[in-house]
Amino acid sequence: MENIMNNPVIGVVMCRNRLKGHATQTLQEKYLNAIIHAGGLPIALPHALAEPSLLEQLLPKLDGIYLPSSPSNVQPHLYGENGDEPDADPGRDLLSMAIINAALERRIPIFAICRGLQELVVATGGSLHRKLCEQPELLEHREDPELPVEQQYAPSHEVQVEEGGLLSALLPECSNFWVNSLHGQGAKVVSPRLRVEARSPDGLVEAVSVINHPFALGVQWHPEWNSSEYALSRILFEGFITAWQHHIAEKQRL
């Protein structure tokens, strides 16, 4: 039996909430299971690791950074807008912005989902639509909370893959496919540091990658949902996990 301790170590950014009156940081198991099924070893990253000296010690131990989704939203001041965000998680924002920039500098693989994509957009100088439902030209991208969870995560709309990017390389025989949709915010302005990898039929950005980086991919949908049952989702996670081999080889050449 393979020793999981030999698998690539993937740092997973946690989310803050409250449990019986106590400040708590958690991760949904679907995100962790997707990493394990793809051959990685997930390690939870609490927000205190945003401290620069701790982050500097942590990063050499990680083979990848995983930014899962969250009920919270990125604080608007981080992308130049005024106002408060009622569903904020400042600790996650602090860690995510710090670890994204540090990982990009060190060329560590990154996989970002939903809020994670939005963090990747903001960290590289872009901005967000705070309420997609107020943009008349856009589809309804939120889930129906009255439906059973299985139906909330059912395919909702198509995405069109842009040619010549990371996503098309991972999915060479698949230029468009259906995805689930469970988000109220989305990318508004994408910085020149990013490449748009896919869009929904209304033109909204559904996937991005960082230019001149071996693997820094963000997707707006949720491939972690029953990831082992869907070939497209497995390919994305396996691509992320195997990217660490290229990262190690690159470090050895330096």
UniProtKB/Swiss-Prot annotation:
Keyword Hydrolase recorded: yes
Gene Ontology cellular component terms for the protein in this record: cytosol
Protein known as: Gamma-glutamyl-gamma-aminobutyrate hydrolase
Enzyme's top EC category: hydrolase
Source organism (scientific name): Shigella flexneri
Record EC number: 3.5.1.94
Pathway per the UniProt entry: Amine and polyamine degradation; putrescine degradation; 4-aminobutanoate from putrescine: step 4/4
Organism placement in taxonomy: Bacteria, Pseudomonadati, Pseudomonadota, Gammaproteobacteria, Enterobacterales
GO terms, molecular function: gamma-glutamyl-gamma-aminobutyrate hydrolase activity
Reactions listed under catalytic activity: 4-(gamma-L-glutamylamino)butanoate + H2O = 4-aminobutanoate + L-glutamate
Family under the similarity heading: Belongs to the peptidase C26 family.
GO biological process terms on file: putrescine catabolic process
PANTHER family referenced in this protein's UniProt entry, alphabetically: GLUTAMINE AMIDOTRANSFERASE PB2B2.05-RELATED
PROSITE patterns, per database record: GATASE_TYPE_1
Domain Glutamine amidotransferase type-1: 16-250
Keywords: Glutamine amidotransferase, Hydrolase
Role summary: Involved in the breakdown of putrescine via hydrolysis of the gamma-glutamyl linkage of gamma-glutamyl-gamma-aminobutyrate.
Gene3D superfamilies (UniProt xref): 3.40.50.880
Residues of the active site: 114, 222, 224
